[in-house]
Amino acid sequence: MDSFEKLVQMFREFPGIGPRQARRFAFFVVSLNYSFAHDLLKTLNNAKETV
C-alpha cells in the first residue's frame, strides 16, 4: 500500500467518514502547501498531548 492509500485508510477510521470522503480529505491534505501541512501536524500533535 502506498502512502496515499494509507492516508485514505487512516481517514476512513474517523467516525462517519466513508471511502469517498476519506479520499477527498487525503487529496486535500496532499495538496496543502508545506507551511500549512506542517502547522496542521504540529497542532494535531499538541492537541493529542494536551487533551
Predicted regions and their residues:
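Cys/His-rich Zn2+-binding cysteine-cluster or related metal-binding knuckle/ribbon modules and their
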Residues: 2-13, 23-51
